[in-house]
A protein has these predicted regions:
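Class I SAM-dependent methyltransferase SAM/SAH-binding core
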Residues: 151-153, 158-204
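Conserved beta-strand signature within the Rossmann-like core of class I S-adenosyl-L-methionine
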Residues: 241-249
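A short SAM/SAH-binding and catalytic strip from SAM-dependent methyltransferases
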Residues: 213-227
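Helix-start (N-cap) detector for alpha-helical repeat units in TPR-like alpha-solenoids
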Residues: 14-15, 48-49, 82-83
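A short glycine-rich, Lys/Arg-flanked "PGG" loop and its adjoining helix->strand segment in the class I
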Residues: 228-240
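A short acidic, Gly/Pro-enriched loop at the edge of an enzyme's catalytic core
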Residues: 205-215
């Protein structure tokens, strides 16, 4: 159990108890870990990382009310929510579903950037960009057009895994991501004509109408609860005939759920409704497994939609 963001307490004894608690948690001793985290926050009451870890372990022990109190303490001490405590409150049904804190997403991916490709491709058998590209090519073939794009946007480009998949299809390729360290990794691959570090919704709002003929988002929409506002923002920057292609995780029920891994899963009906709200025409909505988790396939969907 490792928090995506760690900030020392400034108290050596508290930091040591936190470290020992992490070791116990990783060995599966949640009760022992919780005791150490409780000692850490007693020594350093403003120790945000220890409060967060305490919330995680109490949740694992099914001590819901204590976990909720710990996560609320995290938010009080760090309103930017770099640890993602608000997401845990959503999971514990102590807070309604909403957007992910940008500072949490940034710190999470800054932490993983250097090992991201290996962890995702080798560890989780990630193949989202390739499957998404195949769907784009198939949609173009069905429409009797070439899979060739004047100006493509890789939304949430990360380290450039998506860029590698669509670079052969794009005259110009723009990448945008919230994480500076992920963008550094993408820059080293020399796939993009331009890379931008920015909040994705903010970036879309700053663009003129109808500037892209492809918006490509592999493994990005899993970080948004309601897809409709994002789909609307993407539709505005698409030129007539342009395509929006994205992948999501899905589930058999209705609406949106927040999974154990703190990623949103969207029902097929929610995806259809979001595309309709954006005024786009759905071309493809196929079942797909873009990644594994614990050697088990994660159910997903691949969507391709067009602006008429």
């Amino acid at each position: 159990m490792t928090a995506p963001f760690f900030q020392t307490s400034g108290n050596l004894l508290a930091d040591r108890r936190y470290t020992f608690g992490q070791e116990l948690a990783e060995r599966g001793d949640a009760a022992g870990a919780a005791d150490l985290f409780a000692q850490a926050v007693e020594l350093a009451p403003a120790f945000v990382s220890a409060w967060f870890a305490l919330g995680e372990t109490r949740a694992r022990l099914d001590e819901k009310s204590v976990a909720i109190d710990a996560f609320r303490k995290v938010l009080a001490l760090d309103p930017a929510d770099r640890h993602g405590a608000g997401l845990h409150l959503m999971r514990l049904q102590a807070k309604g579903l909403g957007g992910m804190p940008p500072d949490y997403v940034r710190s999470l991916f800054d932490q993983y950037a250097a090992r991201f490709d290996t962890a995702l491709v080798e560890g989780l058998a990630y193949r989202g960009p390739e499957l998404l590209r195949v769907s784009v090519e198939a949609a173009c073939a069905a429409a009797g057009r070439r899979a060739s794009f004047r100006m493509a946007l890789d939304l949430g480009c990360g380290t450039g895994l998506g860029g590698a998949a669509i670079r052969p299809l794009a005259g110009r390729l723009i990448g945008v991501d919230l994480s500076p360290k992920m963008v550094e990794q993408a820059k080293a691959k020399k796939l993009y004509d331009r890379l931008v570090v920015e909040n994705l919704v903010t970036f879309l709002k700053l663009q003129s109408d109808a500037v892209f003929d492809l918006v490509f988002a592999a493994d990005v929409f899993a970080y948004f609860a309601d897809l409709a506002p994002l789909a609307v923002a993407c539709a505005r920057v698409l030129e007539p005939g342009g395509l929006l292609a994205f992948s999501v995780e899905t589930h058999a029920g209705d609406g949106v759920i927040l999974g154990e891994k703190l990623r949103f899963a969207h029902a097929r009906t929610h995806v259809r409704a979001a595309i309709a709200a954006a005024g786009l025409r759905l071309l493809t909505l196929d079942d797909a497994v873009t990644r594994n988790d614990g050697n088990m396939p994660v159910p997903g969907l691949i969507a391709v939609a067009a602006r008429d």
